[in-house]
């Protein structure tokens, strides 16, 4: 439902930076919902952001970037309560927005944020690293993401995740991750994209790899591995076979049909 009289303040982006983001990050064309369409009953506005509870201990955070010529572009991540602490998946677009996520956690959950894991080296996932570091939060990313971060204009995470041949994170590199089950499905949207399942729930986060079940395209393929995209999407589905709620970066949560549809679109790239 459109909410024409409700406008979010969103991060501003220069035309030059917008062009760079379209080349190196997620294209606006892959991001279908308007702000009004993204908001649903029960969503909570907090400053520039929107928060949606997905499960008793899981919330989706949504931030917006004002991209000239395209309007407000939404990006989603997760907040997970694990006993007496909080875990975060992905930053917002900017440091200021990421600080708002931390403020919301303080106000609504009032538990310390123990760590954050980011799912690849683009601004929508990694643009708020300085805010996390300023708050003393341990940050983790795929080792390849940390390698790519400087050339993407991003700040690298403090710790690098490595992965076994079967795609699962090496436990020694992901200490105290609790319910976060981190999986590298193979290259797809980017060479470094990782995914996260939430143990004890029916939720799996596909990040920018997975598109919703009504998507018309896979969006920006500038950094994509078109040869392996379909296999990587299917590997994500196989890694989390019991997940019935698929959360992704640029659409509302969907069913497993999102995985099937993404893989079928990617089949056409080969």
From Swiss-Prot:
Transmembrane ranges, per UniProt, are none
* Residues making up the signal peptide according to the UniProt record: 1-28
- What InterPro entries does its record include? Metallo-B-lactamas, NDM-1-like, RibonucZ/Hydroxyglut_hydro
Question: What keywords are assigned to this protein?
Answer: Antibiotic resistance, Hydrolase, Metal-binding, Periplasm, Plasmid, Signal, Zinc
Record-annotated residues binding Zn(2+) 2? 124, 208, 250
Which top EC class applies here? hydrolase
EC id: 3.5.2.6
| Primary localization | periplasm
Per the record, what are the reactions this protein catalyses?
a beta-lactam + H2O = a substituted beta-amino acid
This protein's cofactor list reads: Zn(2+)
Recorded family membership = Belongs to the metallo-beta-lactamase superfamily. Class-B beta-lactamase family.
Its biological purpose is as follows: Confers resistance to the different beta-lactams antibiotics (penicillin, cephalosporin and carbapenem) via the hydrolysis of the beta-lactam ring. Does not confer resistance to the polymixin colistin or the fluoroquinolone ciprofloxacin.
Protein name, per record: Metallo-beta-lactamase type 2
What species does this protein belong to?
Answer: Klebsiella pneumoniae
